[in-house]
Every structure is written in C-alpha cells, then in structure tokens.
C-alpha cells in the first residue's frame, strides 16, 4: 500500500494497480517472467469489440507510463490478448410454455459469459482477466442446463479452425491462446443452435 501510495511499481500487483487505472484499459493481468527481471502486462481495452484498431497507441502509452513507475533494472512488456475463433454448435429443446427463441438467447448469453476472460470476483466485485484457465465442456453444459425452460441441451461441436501455434485476431472474440484448447478461455464465439419446443 505504501508503494502504491507513492504511485510506484515493484510487484506484479503494483503494475496491475497502475495499469487498471490507466485511461483506456478495462482490466489487466500482470506476472513475472520466469528467470528475468521483467513484468509481463496483458491488457483488455475498455469497450473492446475484438478489433485491433487502437491497440498500438494504447500499448505505447501504457508502456511509457509504466516505464516512469518501475524501478531501475525492471523490464515492462505490455501486450494484448490473442484472439482465436471458436465454433460452438448445440441442440436445444425448450420446455412447453417457454419461448424457444428467448431460451436460445439465454443459452447463447450463458456460453458467452462462461467463455469470456473478463471475470468479476464475487466477494470484491472487482474485475480480473482470467487467462490460461481450463475450459471444461461439462462445466459449461451444466451451467446451461440450469437455465429455466430447457428440456434438453447437448453440445454437438466445440472447436476452432485455427491450428495450434497460429494465434489470430478476430473481430468476434479474444483469448489468450496457449498450445492446447483446454487451457484457453474465449471471449465471444461463433454460436449456432438447433432449437425446438418439446
């Protein structure tokens, strides 16, 4: 707290504190890079739609700002999440008496919520960026099946067309991409559902 009061940065938590309050940054995650005296800062801009426009200016401005706050000998690397397209398809049967289109919208919203890397800590109501967390299809499916009005739900496809090691930027989604699908959290997705009423 004393360091933060002086508006200086030494630990990853200090860099996160300064990055999160920087204009244009919605949330950041900061970590030490193993074996070096460097801080790796990943940021998500405010009101980001997945496009790359404006990234360079924000990265440069934040890097310059953090360079004035770091101690001598520390390297600051500011980067962005990597976007990776994902395709989710499912079959859905709505219970009688429920609007199947509204149930479908609720399902799509739940998928987006589960795969979104921007998370809120329930106790503190503070946002954080979850990068590198495991994604479990069963976990997502259980959350969706709890939605009111669902009689049957099954994911038929959950994949990406991008080969491992070739991260891309997409206007639809953002994710920190690691080598395995199971270690990726997605922001948005291409979702298609086949829906019927019971």
Model-identified regions with their sequence ranges:
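Immediate N-terminus of the mature polypeptide
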Residues: 81, 124-127, 153-198
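C-terminal structured "cap/appendage" subdomains that terminate the fold
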Residues: 111-166
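Carbohydrate-recognition loop of C-type lectin domains
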Residues: 2, 6-133, 195-198
């Amino acid at each position: 707290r004393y360091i933060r009061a002086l508006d200086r940065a030494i630990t990853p938590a200090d860099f996160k504190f300064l990055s999160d309050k920087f204009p244009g940054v919605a949330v950041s995650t900061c970590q030490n890079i193993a074996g070096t005296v460097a801080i790796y800062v990943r940021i998500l801009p405010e009101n980001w739609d997945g496009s790359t426009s404006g990234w360079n200016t924000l990265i440069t401005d934040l890097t310059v700002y953090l360079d004035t706050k770091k101690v001598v000998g520390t390297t600051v690397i500011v980067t962005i999440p990597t976007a990776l397209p994902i395709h989710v398809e499912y079959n859905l049967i709505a219970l009688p008496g429920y609007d199947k289109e509204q149930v479908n919208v609720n399902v799509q919203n739940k998928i987006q919520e589960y795969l979104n890397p921007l998370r809120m800590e329930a106790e503190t109501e503070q946002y954080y960026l979850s990068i590198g967390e495991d994604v479990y299809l069963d976990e997502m499916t259980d959350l969706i099946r709890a939605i009111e009005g669902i009689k049957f739900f099954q994911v038929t496809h959950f994949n990406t067309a991008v080969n491992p090691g070739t991260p891309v930027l997409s206007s639809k989604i953002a994710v920190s991409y690691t080598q395995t699908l199971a270690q990726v959290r997605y922001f948005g997705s291409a979702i298609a559902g086949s829906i019927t009423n019971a």
